[in-house]
Amino acid sequence: MIIIEKIKRGLIVSCQALENEPLHSSFIMSKMALAAKMGGAIGIRANGVNDISQIKLEVDLPIIGIIKRNYNNCDVFITPTMKEIDELCNEGVDIIALDATFRNRPDGVLLDDFFESIKKKYPKQCLMADISSLDEAINADKLGFDFIGTTLYGYTKSTNGLDIADNDFNFLKALINSNFKSTLIVEGKIDTPLKAQKCFEMGVDLVVVGGAITRPVEITKKFVEKINQVKR
């Protein structure tokens, strides 16, 4: 696919701000995407059709689109149903990312069936699997996802608190050694340039960074926390 050729190697910046965050604005996210492009990003990950629409007006970079939507406190909230797929496809997005964990989806549809339905309805749409474990990655590769992302590693009940860098990047090593047909994208807790660099040194070609670049509240807190540790 053409999009896979366009997004071969480099940094993807996740430009997202939730409703309770001060930068929550499609206009602001479009400018954040522009800043990311000016800094050398080769792609953008964005949440919601409003943000995506504005970002497309500002930059010509490939976009990984998602819709975060909660259904009855279901754990799966990243592009969880066909409704969100339809919205993203109607807007037009290069890659759609969705929760590809083994957790129950809000509509009760199994991931394998969901993937098949998407491919039947939108056969040319590139899809990214957001996974949290090696078994989920193996399953996503078997299904035929174009991309596999480590997005949810550390964010599910079974992986809560884990970091991609734990045990000298052991989880990432296992993924790389699996030699997937799908393109691997490292995402989640890549909070320093050195972590990103390490991923590339290991052979990864695509890394997504979000909060470390685009969430000034959290960035400020880290500075304040370190400053406050100094006793005088």
UniProtKB/Swiss-Prot annotation:
GO terms for cellular component: cytosol. Keywords: Carbohydrate metabolism, Isomerase. One of its GO terms (biological process) is carbohydrate metabolic process. It catalyses: an N-acyl-D-glucosamine 6-phosphate = an N-acyl-D-mannosamine 6-phosphate. GO terms for molecular function: N-acylglucosamine-6-phosphate 2-epimerase activity. It holds the Pfam family NanE. InterPro entries: Aldolase_TIM (IPR013785), NanE (IPR007260), RibuloseP-bd_barrel (IPR011060). It is an enzyme of class 5 (isomerase). Its EC number is 5.1.3.9. Pathway: Amino-sugar metabolism; N-acetylneuraminate degradation; D-fructose 6-phosphate from N-acetylneuraminate: step 3/5. Converts N-acetylmannosamine-6-phosphate (ManNAc-6-P) to N-acetylglucosamine-6-phosphate (GlcNAc-6-P). PANTHER family: N-ACETYLMANNOSAMINE-6-PHOSPHATE 2-EPIMERASE-RELATED. Belongs to the NanE family. This is Putative N-acetylmannosamine-6-phosphate 2-epimerase. It comes from Borrelia garinii subsp. bavariensis (strain ATCC BAA-2496 / DSM 23469 / PBi) (Borreliella bavariensis).
